[in-house]
């Protein structure tokens, strides 16, 4: 998706879902179009729920069917709240963890790194790292993620050494800045400042209709 199109989506959703530092929403926090600044919509409950759903879909780069399956699975499980289950599924995707560890500037960039084979994963029960090229690959507690050593010499990681020194990952992740290695310490919860900007409960209600 082109930058201009993505940032129009950001402005329409009133949230920077592209993750870019120069996102147009930061300069123009109102919908696109000649009447964008003055535009006011009388929001219904359904409209609000739809808006929240769209935010998360674009934020995590999900297809409609994929996102619906995430919600349906979260509604079926009994081990945690539905909101926590949804957040857990979204945040423990390999592309998102790659982004959260600071290995990529945006989720879209992290998705590309995974697709192109730059990211390796080691399951807690295994001894060796293996290449994983599936962005939606679900990670578990104890799993480790690292950048393929040979890839560090390539273009996508040109400024990583400088940027990663300033990066602070969320508390549920551990980051080894010297080894470009991350580990899942625990699962994220909706009580943390992760889902700021969108309402998971509204999204669950939307799909529960």
What residue ranges belong to the model's regions?
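Ferredoxin-like alpha/beta domains used as RNA- or RNAP-binding modules
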Residues: 1-101, 124-209
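Short, well-ordered loop/turn sites that connect or cap secondary structure elements
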Residues: 104-107, 113-114, 119, 133, ...
């Amino acid at each position: 998706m082109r930058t201009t199109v993505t940032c129009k989506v950001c402005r329409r959703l009133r949230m920077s879902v592209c993750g870019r530092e120069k996102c147009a929403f930061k300069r123009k926090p109102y919908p696109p179009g000649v009447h964008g600044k003055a535009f006011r919509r009388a929001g219904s409950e359904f409209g609000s729920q739809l808006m929240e759903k769209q935010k998360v879909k674009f934020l995590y780069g999900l297809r409609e069917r994929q996102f619906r399956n995430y919600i349906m699975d979260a509604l079926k499980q009994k081990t945690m709240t539905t909101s926590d289950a949804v957040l857990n599924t979204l945040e423990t995707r390999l592309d998102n963890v790659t982004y959260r560890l600071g290995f990529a500037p945006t989720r879209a960039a992290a998705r590309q790194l995974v697709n192109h084979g730059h990211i390796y994963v080691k399951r807690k029960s295994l001894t060796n790292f293996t290449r994983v090229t599936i962005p939606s690959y679900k990670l578990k507690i104890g799993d480790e993620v690292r950048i393929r050593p040979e890839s560090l010499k390539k273009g996508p990681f040109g400024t990583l050494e400088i940027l990663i020194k300033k990066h602070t990952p969320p508390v549920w992740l551990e980051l080894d800045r010297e080894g470009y290695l991350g580990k899942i310490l625990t699962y994220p919860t909706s009580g943390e400042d992760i889902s700021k900007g969108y309402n998971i409960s509204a999204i669950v209600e939307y799909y529960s209709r």
